[in-house]
Amino acid sequence: MYKTKGGFQLTLQTLSLVVGFMAWSIIAPLMPFIKQDVNVTEGQISIILAIPVILGSVLRVPFGYLTNIVGAKWVFFTSFIVLLFPIFFLGQAQTPGMLMASGFFLGVGGAIFSVGVTSVPKYFPKEKVGLANGIYGMGNIGTAVSSFLAPPIAGIIGWQTTVRSYLIIIALFALIMFIFGDTQERKIKVPLMAQMKTLSKNYKLYYLSYWYFITFGAFVAFGIFLPNYLVNHFGIDKVDAGIRSGVFIALATFLRPIGGILGDKFNAVKVLMIDFVIMIIGAVILGISDHIALFTVGCLTISICAGIGNGLIFKLVPSYFSNEAGSANGIVSMMGGLGGFFPPLVITYVANLTGSSHLAFIFLAVFGCIALFTMRHLYQKEYGSLKHS
C-alpha cells in the first residue's frame, strides 16, 4: 500500500497543492505590472497582498476537519471549482476593490494545505510520516512557480491574460482529482467540538501554532512582500525581483522534506531549537542590512530555516495529535498562514513611521527568541534536561 496507493495519492495531492499555491500567490509577483494599470497606493498594495492570506488561513481548520469526514478527493475538487471564480474576476480587475475581493477568495488555494497534511499520513507508517508530509509540503513550490513564470509571461502577453491562463490549469486539476482521487480514504469521524475541547487543553497545540506562525509565516510573508520591496527599495528590475523571490520560495520548499527527515531521525524539538537560533541570526542580518548582498544573505538564511522548520513542525503535529489530526493540522496551519498576513503590513507601517523597514526584521528575531523559551519548556517536560539528552 505504501509503495502503490500511498505513493500515488502523495504525488496527486502534492501536485494539487502546487496548483493551489500558484493561484493563492498570483497577485504578488504581478503587482509591479498591475499597479501600472490600476491606480493603487503603497498602503493599498500592502493590504491587497495580505488579503489572500486571511481566507487561506481561516479555512484551514474546516478543511482539515472535512478531509477526515469526506476525504481529500472531494475537498480538493470543490476547492478547485471555487477557485475558478476569483481567478476569472482577477483577470478583469480594474480597481483596488476588485483586486481585494478577488484576492480574498484566492485564499481557498492556500487553505487546501491542511487537506494533504491530514490525508497523507493515513497512507504511511509512523516512521515515514515526517518525510511524507515534507514531500507534500513541497507543493508550496507553487508560490515559486508563480514568482518565476508569471512576470516574464506577463511581460509578453500582459498580466490579465497571464491570470486567465490559470483557469485552464485549475480546471484540469479539478478533473484529474475527480477521476483519480481516493474514494476509499480512511475516515475519522470524531465530533468537532469534542476534538476542540481536547485540543484546547493541550499546551503543545499552542506552542506548535506559535512556532509555525513564525516559520510558515516567514515563508508566506517574504513571498508576498519581496517582489515589490526589491523593486522599490533596491531598484531591481521587475522580472529579476520575481526570480529572486522565487529562489527564496523554492529553497524553503525543497528543504521542507529535509526538515521532515531530520524529525524522523533525530529529536525534532532539539533540531528545531538549532534551526531557530540560525533563523534569529538571519533576522538580525536583515535588520542591519542596507546593501543588496547582505540583504540576500539574510533572506537566504531565513529561507533555509523556514523550510526546515516547516518540515520539523509537521513531523510533530501528527505524533502529538493522532485522534484530532485534522483539526490540529488545520489550527496549526491556520496560524502559519496568519503569520504571513501581518508582516507585510508591519513592514509598510514601520517604513512609513521610521523611514526604514529594519525594525520590522528585528521583531522577527524577538519572536524567534520567545519561541526558543517555549521549545526549551516543552523539551524539558517531554524529554528531561537538555544537558543529559
Swiss-Prot record:
* A GO MF label: nitrate transmembrane transporter activity
Q: What does the entry list under GO cellular component?
A: plasma membrane
Query: What is the induction note for this entry?
Result: Positively regulated by the two-component system NreB/NreC.
One Pfam family recorded for the sequence? MFS_1
Q: Which domain of life is it from?
A: Bacteria
Q: What protein family is recorded?
A: Belongs to the major facilitator superfamily. Nitrate/nitrite porter (TC 2.A.1.8) family.
| Protein name per Swiss-Prot or TrEMBL | Probable nitrate transporter NarT
Give the organism, scientific name.
Staphylococcus aureus (strain MRSA252)
Q: What is this protein's gene name?
A: narT
